[in-house]
Amino acid sequence: LGDVYKRQSMGSVLLMCKLFGMDEAMTVSLIPKSVTTPIAVSVAEGHGGMVPITVVAVIFTGILGSIFAPTLIRLFRVNDPMIAGISIGACSHAVGTSKAIELGETEGAMSGLAIGVCGILTVLFSMILMH
């Protein structure tokens, strides 16, 4: 699930940036938006991105995920706490994980696990997508 999400998330950011005519530096800055700030900054710096843009994108993604995750989980009738936690952690990193912990112990644990897995996948996929 995390692997599929990461490829789709990074691919959709890449596609949207191309569609809207954004330059390479902006694209590289936005691609790692769904991981923790230290990983996102490292990925952006390593590929010539603008760190301030990356930091804002990461924070914005985390806050939106934290706000909308409970509603989306109910809307899509996600009843499995493991799936809910993985989804929250994969999409909205540590800020979302704080919301997942409020939802339940399993959600929080799986969200934390998803942060690590998605961080690793982001580093690997960014090397593929950005070259």
Predicted regions mapped to residue ranges:
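Short, small-residue-biased leader/transition segments that mark boundaries at the very start
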Residues: L1-Y5
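Short helix-capping/hinge motifs at transmembrane helix termini and TM-loop junctions
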Residues: F20-M22, G48, R77, M130
